[in-house]
Structures are given as structure tokens and as C-alpha cells.
């Protein structure tokens, strides 16, 4: 069964991580998002915002929570920017990187808490319309917490991890106490009831394992939280 069937040329489709949406490039100059179950579509970028030069010249990637897309946005021939698109199209596209140089191929890392991309802003380059150029890899931190952790010294980072491990062990001990009490209660019930409870617990745990944390963005001073 065709997921998209119309008179348009639809290519470079990318599924959202949760499998509920698909984002194709329509007629090479429009990026859409389509809900697979309902068939509803929204336009993220249209033909007035994109141009086409060759096959495969559109680059975008889904966020882990399936709510955002990073896109290489090149309206002009002499530079490319990185934009953040709301997959529901309720928010306007937001420029994350707008250096005036070529900023390309943005990718989500650290479960969506950061992105990395390539830029020739500080590399060797030809200022003619053609010629070779040198790219470096940069990273942007979407939260202040992530940026602060990145800038910790080695000793500070070790201390932070030690505190987190201690807190985790304490939580585990507390959970173990609860589990022991629960087991005592279950032992008083028949094996059939035990199996039902265990089965339900497994289903709940499986659902929790599949849950993806919704991404957070600290917009203030975002452009300053960049490392090469």
C-alpha cells in the first residue's frame, strides 16, 4: 500500500523515530510532514523558500522525540544555514545557525540534547563561486545544563558523576525495599494472580522503555553555547 500517492514527485522520505510520521520532499522544493494513520499533511518549507539544483540536495533529520526536524537551509548559492522546524508546523522555522558561510548536515546527538554540523566559517576557502573549502565540526548545546556540564573540569565532572551514582544507589535501595514488601504480598496470593501481576508489570516496563523524553530548548544565549 502506498503511503503517499499523488501526481507530485515525492522523494527522500524520512520516517519519524516513533514511526507515526513521514517527511518527504515534494517536487524537489517542498518539505512536508504526513501523519501515516490520518493522512493529514503540513508544509514546513515550500517552493518560495527552497530551490533545487540536483537530486539529493535537501538534507534534514528527525529529532529523537519526533517533534522537530533539523534542516540544511540554503536559499542562496553562496551560503547555507541550519534551521529548526516544528514538525506540526505550529511554530515558525527558527534559525539556529546563520553565520553567512556554509553550515551543513546538522545531526542530533546526545539523545537530542545537542546537534553537530559542519561549517567552513573558520576553514580555508575560496571566495570565488567555485573551488575547494575546508570544513570543521561544531556542536550546539540546546540546554544550559548540557553546556555547563561540557565545560566542567575533569575533577568537577568526576565529582558530578560520583554524586549521581550515589543518588542512583540510594534510589535502588529504596526500590529494593518496596520490591521486598511487594513480594511478601504476592506470596500470599495464588500463582495465577502472581502471573497476572507480573505480566502487567512487564507490559508497563516495556512501555516505559519505549518512552522518549521530550526535548527541551533553552533559547536564551543559544548561539553562545557552541563548541568547535
Predicted regions and their residues:
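A structural signal for short secondary-structure junctions
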Residues: 76-77, 107-110, 132, 220-223
